[in-house]
Amino acid sequence: MKIAIAGGGIGGLTLALALHRVGLSPVVFEQAPQIREVGVGINTLPHAIRELADLGLLKALDSIAIRTKTLVYKTATGQNIVSQPRGTWAGYDVPQFSIHRGMLQRVLADAVVERLGSDAIKTGHRLNAFSQTADAVALSVTPEDRVEQTYAFDALVGADGIHSV
């Protein structure tokens, strides 16, 4: 089965790795000219980390992220309102990580290229439109500064955010 993923963000890249784990070879179309480490810090809860660990990424993430130990809320004068343990300190089998969003995306992109090959992520490829028949999905894609191309896949997953086609 040939699967296209529109969007090379955290969701699209994670999906590509999950599909590869079950024997499929998806292709990710990302309109940005390259995967860049942009964004802000995020907290990834143990439920998400468990999924990423199942994809074999725990060691890579642990080497660049901060294990979040405690969540603390304080008043403006510094008095504790609440303090709660997080991740392994809260009894989960995996940590909660604080990580830069772009660094997480980089780990995912590197894993996709390592496992599926350099053609698995097509950066600089904007999905313009798609049409579906009983047998296939046709994608109209414009590579950066080039002529529109058509690709045929069995399925298309939209992971391209709020401006999705």
Which residues are covered by each model-predicted region?
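Conserved N-terminal helical subregion
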Residues: 3, 47-165
